[in-house]
Amino acid sequence: MLGLNHTSMSEFILVGFSAFPHLQLMLFLLFLLMYLFTLLGNLLIMATVWSERSLHTPMYLFLCVLSVSEILYTVAIIPRMLADLLSTQRSIAFLACASQMFFSFSFGFTHSFLLTVMGYDRYVAICHPLRYNVLMSPRGCACLVGCSWAGGSVMGMVVTSAIFQLTFCGSHEIQHFLCHVPPLLKLACGNNVPAVALGVGLVCIMALLGCFLLILLSYAFIVADILKIPSAEGRNKAFSTCASHLIVVIVHYGFASVIYLKPKGPHSQEGDTLMATTYAVLTPFLSPIIFSLRNKELKVAMKRTFLSTLYSSGT
């Protein structure tokens, strides 16, 4: 898959949370509970959309696919992090490190692309309702979903290939809980490291900023159309279909901007690790909560699905 350059070292050591030895057991239990809740919440959303025929619409199809991407993203990161919290042996093979970076970036960017697609879906539903069935046909939805996954895979491949073509020398300790770009760049040596760092940074920022601007543009048109609705009840009903998606977008990009766009200055590695953990663990944890609480139709359907599952298991 990659022309990996590992002439200087064959494995890395994930330092992770070694600076917090007294907190590792507590962090393990906390992250394990959040991880299990993330999996169960997203699986419940998927089961509900699958079982309720009234939810077989593009909006809930995209939500279901978003849940898949969140499950895969957390699976790519959190199990390894949990294992390291209980272990003193935190080495990770070169190929395993590259694989973790590829999958985490692929599913992370797929998540961003799907949020953009969901924004477009809401724009079409509110601003062009008469053309909705044409623009959001099954074939069109499949194309949007396929492009999101393909785009995420391409981004993961581009970033991983660029980083692991570098030569790594000196220390093999990654000052992070996963194989991430900034700490790996600190271990790389060679004249091309600054160019690779700049290129990878620009590609990631342009992709994420492009998604964010498209979402903003969609909501600019949505708000403009909602304000034209004469009744307050109509405006509230129209906006309620967008509220959960908008909150998830704010949480997703809010945490990402705090972590990746914070000004460079004197700050501890421990602080960076905790902030990155917030993004990797807390964001997927909050997403199913927001969608299930803010979407009345989904909330009612989830209760019905959950109760029917309990009843069938009880009998």
Curated annotation (Swiss-Prot):
Extracellular membrane side: 1-25, 76-99, 161-197, 260-272
Record's keyword annotation contains Cell membrane: yes
Residue ranges crossing the lipid bilayer per the database entry: 26-46, 55-75, 100-120, 140-160, 198-218, 239-259, 273-293
Keywords, in A-Z order: Cell membrane, Disulfide bond, G-protein coupled receptor, Glycoprotein, Membrane, Olfaction, Receptor, Sensory transduction, Transducer, Transmembrane, Transmembrane helix
Disulfide bonds: C97-C189
Record topological domains on the Cytoplasmic side: 47-54, 121-139, 219-238, 294-315
Cellular compartment(s): Cell membrane
GO cellular component terms attached to this protein's record: plasma membrane
Membrane topology: Multi-pass membrane protein
Glycosylation sites: N5
Family: Belongs to the G-protein coupled receptor 1 family.
Protein name: Olfactory receptor 10H2
